[in-house]
């Protein structure tokens, strides 16, 4: 059969019979059926091949990684959907009717009927019936989903029949054929409606084992039409419009997007390269996205083609009938809708890929983190310029999750721009421009291509400047984070002004870089808006001046529209290439991390048959790694202490030959930095094994473990407790089945009952980020409780008694470490509490500098002289405590909030009152609802500038829009001139009428048109447009920088001088978020998005006004359409804002859990919880992807409706022009059609940008909120009756006089009627049980709490009459938690740079830290003061505490206050510090020490015993010891085990007196 048509394709306002019969009725339907059959066969054989490898079993968490791939990778194939059965039965009837019609035409057709086309329709209908029959039998449902085939074929048939019906009605077809065609059209209309509107339902219900998946998501069950128009989101959008969305309102995530499905599938990909693995994994999605992008690329160019035809009709109406003109107008509407649907589907497919890419990459990174080796990062010296590059730091790994995965996932949604949209649209646009402008059109496209490098260059320059901004921002955030991390140290020392100056200096650098960024952003935006004008100038120059062509209306404005369409891919390709390069770099960083060396734990501990625990001639070391030549890791909390380093070379444990006693208590002791923590980690297999062997029976597969008996796993309690941001109970139970009896026994053993009873939510209280809502002692006890509750056979404890008082330590040791819960377990206990532990342990290992100095039983080591025999003499004094003897709660360092109880109410630890508030309610980060308050917006606007500034801004926006309109009006005038001349030349009647009626001179000949004149004016207008655009942006950015600087300084001031209670109540992460993300939005996003929003808003107003002025009737339609726009935008804004906020909220748990895994990977591996944490991470990622995808679905929901309304704008504009043909001249019609064509894109950008501005204003609201927090009263609360002496305090006497205070007005007093004296130059100890109020007393001394009653005097001066700065300079407090800053030792010892090298070195020597830090001196440096860029990463906790004490001694304050400052220091060093304090007292320093180690204060001059916030006892040590057995101090001494030593020291002191 010959398919070539000799007649015209279009004849007499309809398609020719040749096209209808040969193509629409025959070739297209048969080809589609053949393609469908081939696709079905390919899918069938492919599915059969895959089915051979499917494991039909399924478990939510597989027992191994490989098994998880087999079990989950193909679950989606069991999820086949179908049209409801009722509709399928109707389908059968309709297709049988279609076949009957074909038979009827074959029998009764006339001579003019093409039988081939009728036969083709019969064959295609039979194929449709065959597909339907297979669908009904469900015989192939596991292999091929045939429902989409039916939908596509019905739609294709309906589309062809639409044109056939049009031709049959307007042509001379036979009556039977016309009727049959109309009936067929009706049948396929019903079929299409059935398939387009029918919801999809699961063929089979979910299996009970498929517990990973919940109900189908809305988009899975939505109809085809609903998916094309995103109507499946209607319920959610309406719900968001009526009320604020909550997480519970969100739809289920599509199971094909779940991490538990996509991650195992991705792991099954075979290629080595991560990039090609991603391409292979998403190949089908990329092809679908490419298909939609291709359809969109063709559809967007249909309007300018139709516009040209319409304008030609307007110029010469006789060229076509009016019905053809209306066909053009209808085509504008249809093309706009098709382009909108294709564009939305293309973007949606990209976002689906982005979500799955994020899930895949986060899973890859997360599982790698759980397998990564532990690396130690040291400062590299000048002799070693290149840092080892073997390991990523924690900060870099976190950046992989937060930054790099986002770069890659976002780029995956835009790949179509590079490989489809840009090349296809460029080719189509070039062809159309060539048809319009000839060679000049090609020149125009060539110019756009030639200017593309300029776009890329500016984009790269902007990226480079942005990188500098990020670097400066990182420095500023790091400085502010350092303040927040050490805020107590800074406030205690009155260093706010100094550290504020440091931050502001970083801020000034950041503002300078931001100024550069804004300048380049202005250049970029000016270029963005000016390049189309430049291309237009040069194209028209060649077209009119060089080649002297006539540029009429029908040529100029379609060309402008085409250039406008091409501008989008040309501008987006520049950004896409930049983002693609950035994503490629990020992908490389991720791949590099994934290729890092993993932990050797499983190889070292691979001997599963061994029952020994210990080392055999083992030498172990820490790998020394860096990442990106970064020398020092970020200051992140870790569950391990990689800090015991005697030299710049990695620390080593050398020649270990140890056999720990099974089922016994093994104690590891030694001085600070000797390697105790490292030995425990080496036992876990976390250190690199140089030679020898490590023995520790270990199973690392969670599903092989029993939950009701001891298992071959290890419970690990690091020195700095690893606490999850879960409830206290969840931290203890740690994903094991809950056993109430065992749980109660654990709480009893670790003395947590009273603490839990003090919380309103009991054990359902959230521990906070890193345990931020718990005190140090509470965190250690929760960590120990986790170990006891576990079924682990081996327990490793790292100094877990250092943060509790002696009574509590005594209770924990005998009830937990030596209690029933430890029976049958092997315990390795690294500790400094040798007096308590050694007399009762079974085996001892003495360490010094990484070597075993001695090992054996206590008796053996005493006989060898390695242990003091006095320690063993106190053995009988321990264990006298009765069960349940502890009776206090630890509140000194816990969160002081209205939710804390004042007394030990009788509360069930296992049940919480359901009417009580959510435990998170008091600590959740504020999340504003609805629109941002006007007061916040007004605050920001006022800081931008005075009234004259706003007048100037409005003027610049107005003049810029006026000039923009002038460019097109001038083109119109230019084109009109050509139109007039053309009409004059070819229409003598028109020429005579014009001359006679209008008395005008005869127009010039075409060659006499002053093209250069029009070109010159156009160039001038364009230059003015570029200038005012650039100037406007600079003016706005000037105000933005001013506002950013002012608001940030107010934020910094407000937080720095906030009350200490603010930092107790608000988690550090929330405060840091204000200084990082919110400030970034304030600095960079508000102004840029606001400019674009205001510009587009002004442009939209200008377009509507202009079109209405040319076509007044359009105003009627415009009113209704604008109302529809407003309605759609209003209901969209609420949902988009809520989804964005929910996504921000759900992002935090992902980052938090990742941080917890990063810092606790050692504990996770020890407890064999890797698979559990991976599953939890996948759930959190799904919770993040759900609002993310819904947010982008709402964007597409909006996009389709905006495009539809935009198409209506273009349709009505064209309709009114055709309808009012006589009153609208072609040039004006061309201009209004041009603006109408651009309206849809503009309104879409406006709504999206407006939503972004609303979301960004939320950050402004959050920042402004923190500028209004309650401040400390820096000025004196009372007016002094005399001037403060210059040398105050000269003596250092302290007096508490009936002092009473409380944390908040609604809480009971924490100190009540405190009265005692501290004589000048004396040393006074404050002791008491945990929770007695000791630490609160230190806060009172520096007015961290203000007096409610009574007073505190220093040298007779009421401290309320002294400014805070002066007071805190006079009184130096050393807190229990060591505060160490970034910078060298010099910067840490002397932040104000007031002391000499000699003074600092002497102070280091006094606290016994000098020898330790000398080993870190790089090269041949003579002083240790300039080494260690970040001491927190190189010093152990005890050494960091020594550094803080050295800083305190260096200040030489008259009053020194130590708040349990030596709790983490070994006894020998503690004794040395006490000797230093004695030396200080000789020069008149008053020392107040809060202590748990009573032996260290035995020679103090006075002891004050606190109990329940009151002074229970006071006097000299000897006086308190002489009291009867009911004396609190004496009982504390007995419980400490040092009573005899304390009595001896006290007697010697009293004897000296």
UniProtKB/Swiss-Prot annotation:
Record Gene3D superfamilies: ABC transporter type 1, transmembrane domain, P-loop containing nucleotide triphosphate hydrolases
Q: What molecular function does GO assign, one term?
A: ATP binding
Q: Does the keyword Transport apply?
A: yes
**Localisation:** Membrane
InterPro entries cross-referenced by the UniProt entry: AAA+_ATPase (IPR003593), ABC1_TM_dom (IPR011527), ABC1_TM_sf (IPR036640), ABC_transporter-like_ATP-bd (IPR003439), ABC_transporter-like_CS (IPR017871), ABC_transporter_C-like (IPR050173), P-loop_NTPase (IPR027417)
Pfam families reported in the protein's UniProt record? ABC_membrane, ABC_tran
Kindly give the CDD domains that the UniProt entry links to this protein: ABC_6TM_VMR1_D1_like, ABC_6TM_VMR1_D2_like, ABCC_MRP_domain1, ABCC_MRP_domain2
The pathway is: Mycotoxin biosynthesis
Give me the segments passing through the membrane: 27-47, 90-110, 114-134, 151-171, 177-197, 286-306, 324-344, 413-433, 438-458, 527-547, 550-570, 948-970, 1017-1037, 1086-1108, 1113-1135, 1204-1224, 1229-1249
Specify the superkingdom. Eukaryota
Q: Which residues form the ABC transporter domain?
A: 635-874, 1294-1533
Which residues of this UniProt protein bind ATP? 670-677, 1328-1335
Q: Which PANTHER family match?
A: ABC TRANSPORTER ATP-BINDING PROTEIN_PERMEASE VMR1-RELATED, ATP-BINDING CASSETTE SUB-FAMILY C
Q: What does this protein do?
A: ABC-type transporter; part of the gene cluster that mediates the biosynthesis of the mycotoxin cyclochlorotine, a hepatotoxic and carcinogenic cyclic chlorinated pentapeptide. CctS is essential for the biosynthesis of cyclochlorotine, maybe as a chloride channel that supplies chloride for chlorination by cctP2.
Q: What is this protein called?
A: ABC-type transporter cctS
């Amino acid at each position: 059969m010959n398919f070539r048509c000799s007649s015209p394709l279009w004849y007499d306002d309809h398609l020719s019979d040749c096209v209808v019969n040969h193509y629409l009725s025959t070739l297209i339907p048969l080809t589609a059926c053949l393609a469908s059959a081939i696709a079905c066969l390919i899918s069938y054989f492919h599915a059969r091949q895959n089915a051979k490898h499917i494991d039909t079993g399924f478990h939510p968490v597989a027992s191994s990684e490989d098994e998880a791939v087999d079990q989950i990778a193909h679950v989606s194939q069991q999820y086949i959907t179908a049209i409801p059965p009722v509709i399928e039965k109707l389908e059968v009837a309709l297709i049988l009717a279609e076949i009957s019609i074909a038979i009827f035409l074959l029998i009764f057709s006339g001579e003019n009927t093409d039988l081939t086309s009728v036969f083709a329709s019969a064959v295609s209908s039979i194929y449709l019936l065959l597909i339907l029959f297979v669908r009904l039998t469900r015989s192939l449902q596991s292999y091929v989903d045939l429902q989409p085939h039916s939908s596509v074929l019905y739609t294709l048939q309906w589309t062809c029949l639409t044109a056939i019906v049009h031709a049959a009605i307007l042509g001379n077809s036979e009556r039977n054929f016309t009727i049959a065609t109309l009936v067929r059209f009706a049948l396929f209309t019903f079929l299409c409606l059935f398939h387009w509107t029918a919801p999809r339902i699961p063929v089979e219900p979910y299996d009970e084992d498929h517990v990973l998946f919940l109900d189908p998501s809305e988009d899975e069950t939505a109809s085809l039409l609903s998916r094309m128009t995103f109507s499946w989101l209607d319920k959610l959008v309406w719900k968001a419009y009526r009320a604020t969305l909550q997480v519970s309102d969100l739809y289920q995530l599509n199971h094909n997007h779940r991490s538990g499905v996509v991650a195992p599938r991705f792991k099954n990909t075979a290629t080595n390269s991560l990039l090609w693995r991603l391409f292979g994994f998403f190949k089908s999605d990329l092809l679908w996205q490419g298909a939609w992008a291709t359809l969109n690329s063709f559809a967007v160019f249909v309007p300018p083609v139709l516009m040209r035809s319409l304008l030609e009709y307007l110029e010469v109406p006789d060229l076509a009938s009016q019905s053809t003109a209306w066909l053009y107008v209808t085509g504008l509407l249809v093309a706009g809708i098709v382009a909108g649907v294709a564009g939305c589907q293309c973007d949606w497919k990209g976002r689906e890929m982005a979500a799955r890419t994020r899930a895949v990459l986060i899973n890859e990174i997360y599982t790698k983190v759980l397998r990564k080796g532990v690396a130690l990062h040291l400062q590299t010296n000048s002799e070693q310029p290149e840092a080892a590059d073997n390991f990523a730091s924690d900060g870099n790994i976190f950046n992989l999750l937060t930054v790099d995965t986002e770069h890659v996932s976002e780029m995956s949604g835009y790949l179509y721009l590079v490989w489809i949209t840009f090349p296809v649209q460029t080719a189509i646009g070039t062809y159309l421009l060539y048809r319009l402008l000839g060679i000049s059109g090609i020149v125009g496209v060539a110019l756009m291509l030639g200017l593309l490098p300029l776009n890329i260059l500016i984009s790269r320059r902007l990226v480079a400047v942005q990188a500098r901004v990020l670097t400066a921002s990182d420095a500023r955030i790091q400085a502010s984070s350092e303040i927040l991390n050490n805020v107590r140290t800074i406030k205690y020392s009155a260093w706010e002004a100094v550290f504020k100056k440091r931050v502001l200096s970083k801020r000034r650098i950041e503002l300078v870089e931001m100024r550069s960024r804004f300048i380049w952003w202005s250049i970029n935006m000016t270029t963005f808006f000016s390049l189309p004008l430049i291309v237009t100038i040069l194209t028209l120059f060649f077209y009119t001046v060089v080649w002297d062509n006539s540029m009429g209306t029908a040529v100029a404005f379609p060309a402008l529209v085409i250039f406008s369409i091409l501008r989008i891919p040309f501008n987006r390709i520049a950004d896409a290439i930049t983002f693609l390069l950035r994503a490629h770099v990020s992908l490389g960083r991720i791949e590099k991390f994934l290729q890092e060396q993993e932990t050797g734990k499983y190889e070292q501990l691979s001997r599963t048959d061994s029952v020994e625990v210990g080392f055999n001639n083992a030498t172990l070391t820490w790998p020394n790694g860096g990442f990106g030549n970064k020398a020092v890791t970020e200051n992140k909390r870790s569950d391990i202490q990689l800090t015991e380093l005697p030299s710049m070379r990695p620390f080593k444990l050398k020649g270990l030959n140890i056999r720990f006693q099974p089922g016994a208590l093994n104690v590891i002791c030694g001085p600070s930095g000797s390697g105790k923590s490292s030995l425990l980690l080496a036992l876990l297999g976390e250190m690199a094994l140089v030679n020898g062997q490590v023995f520790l029976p270990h199973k690392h597969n969670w599903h092989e473990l029993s939950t009701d008996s001891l298992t071959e796993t290890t419970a690990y309690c690091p020195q700095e407790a690893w606490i999850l941001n879960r409830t206290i109970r969840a931290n203890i139970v740690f994903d094991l089945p809950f056993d109430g009896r065992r749980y109660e026994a654990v709480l009893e053993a670790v003395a947590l009952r009273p603490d839990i009873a003090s919380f309103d939510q009991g054990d359902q209280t959230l521990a906070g980020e890193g345990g931020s809502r718990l005190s140090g002692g509470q965190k250690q006890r929760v960590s120990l409780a986790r170990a006891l509750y576990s079924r682990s056979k081996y327990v490793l404890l790292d100094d877990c008694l250092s943060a509790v008082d002696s009574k509590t330590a005594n209770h924990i040791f005998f009830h937990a470490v030596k209690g029933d819960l430890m029976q049958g377990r092997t315990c390795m206990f690294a500790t400094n509490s040798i007096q308590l532990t050694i007399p009762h342990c079974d085996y001892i290992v003495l360490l010094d500098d990484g070597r075993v100095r001695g090992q054996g039983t206590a008796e053996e080591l005493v006989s060898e002289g390695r242990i003091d025999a006095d320690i063993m003499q106190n053995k009988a004094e321990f264990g006298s405590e009765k069960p349940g003897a502890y009776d206090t709660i630890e509140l000194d360092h816990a969160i002081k909030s209205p939710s804390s109880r004042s007394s030990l109410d009788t509360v069930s630890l296992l049940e919480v009152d359901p009417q009580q508030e959510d435990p998170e309610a008091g600590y959740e980060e504020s999340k504003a609802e609805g629109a941002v308050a006007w007061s916040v917006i007004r605050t920001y606007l006022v800081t931008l500038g005075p009234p004259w500034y706003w007048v100037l801004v409005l003027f610049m926006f107005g003049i810029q829009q006026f000039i923009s309109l002038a460019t097109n009006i001038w083109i119109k005038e230019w084109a009109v001139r050509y139109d007039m001349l053309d009409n004059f030349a070819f229409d003598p009647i028109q020429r005579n009428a014009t001359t006679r009626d209008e008395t005008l001179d005869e127009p010039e000949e075409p060659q006499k048109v002053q093209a250069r004149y029009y070109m010159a004016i156009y160039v001038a207008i364009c230059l003015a447009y570029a200038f005012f655009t650039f100037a406007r942006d600079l003016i706005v950015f000037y105000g933005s920088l001013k506002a950013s600087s002012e608001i940030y300084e107010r934020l910094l001031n407000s937080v720095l001088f906030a009350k200490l209670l603010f930092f107790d109540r608000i988690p550090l992460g929330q405060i840091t978020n204000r200084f990082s993300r919110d400030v970034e939005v304030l600095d960079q996003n508000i102004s840029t998005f606001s400019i674009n929003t205001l510009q587009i808003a002004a442009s939209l107003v200008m377009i509507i006004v202009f079109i209405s002025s040319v076509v007044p009737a359009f105003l009627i339609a415009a009113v209704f359409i604008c109302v529809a726009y407003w309605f759609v935008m209003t209901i969209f804004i609420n949902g988009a804002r809520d989804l964005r906020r929910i996504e921000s909220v759900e992002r935090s748990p992902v980052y938090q859990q990742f941080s917890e895994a990063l810092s606790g990977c050692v504990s996770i591996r020890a407890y064999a919880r890797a698979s559990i944490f991976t599953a939890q991470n996948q759930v959190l990622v799904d919770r993040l992807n759900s609002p993310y995808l819904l947010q982008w679905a709402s964007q597409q929901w909006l996009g389709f409706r905006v495009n539809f309304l935009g198409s209506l704008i273009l349709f009505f504009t064209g309709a009114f022009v055709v309808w009012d043909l006589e009153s609208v001249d072609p040039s004006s019609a061309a201009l209004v059609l041009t603006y109408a064509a651009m309206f849809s894109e503009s309104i879409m950008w406006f709504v999206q940008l407006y939503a972004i501005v609303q979301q960004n204003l939320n950050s402004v609201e959050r920042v402004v909120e923190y500028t209004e927090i309650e401040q400390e009263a820096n000025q004196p609360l009372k007016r002094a009756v005399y001037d403060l002496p210059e040398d105050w305090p000269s003596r250092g006497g302290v007096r508490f006089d009936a002092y009473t205070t409380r944390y908040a007005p609604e809480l009971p007093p924490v100190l009540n009627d405190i009265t005692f004296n501290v004589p000048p130059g004396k040393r006074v100890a404050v002791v008491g049980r945990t929770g007695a109020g000791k630490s609160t007393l230190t806060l009172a001394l520096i007015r961290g709490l203000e007096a409610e009653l009574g007073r505190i005097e220093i040298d007779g001066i009421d401290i309320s009459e002294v400014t805070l700065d002066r007071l805190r300079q006079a009184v130096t407090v050393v807190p229990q938690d060591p505060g160490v800053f970034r910078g060298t030792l010099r910067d840490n010892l002397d932040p104000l740079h007031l002391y000499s090298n000699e003074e600092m070195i002497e102070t280091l020597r006094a606290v016994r830290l000098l020898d330790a830090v000398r080993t870190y001196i790089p090269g041949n440096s003579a002083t240790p003061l300039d080494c260690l860029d970040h001491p927190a990463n190189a010093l152990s906790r005890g050494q960091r505490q020594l550094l803080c004490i050295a800083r305190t001694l260096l200040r030489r304050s008259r009053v020194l206050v130590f708040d349990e400052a030596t709790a983490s220091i070994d006894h020998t060093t503690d004794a040395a510090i006490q000797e230093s304090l004695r030396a200080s007292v000789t020069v008149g320093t008053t020392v107040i020490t809060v202590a748990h180690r009573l032996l260290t204060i035995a020679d103090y001059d006075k002891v004050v015993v606190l109990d329940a916030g009151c002074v229970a006892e006071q006097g000299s040590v000897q006086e308190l010891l002489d009291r009867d057995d009911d004396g609190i101090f004496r009982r504390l001494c007995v419980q400490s085990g040092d009573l005899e030593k304390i009595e001896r020291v006290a007697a010697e002191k009293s004897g000296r007196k």
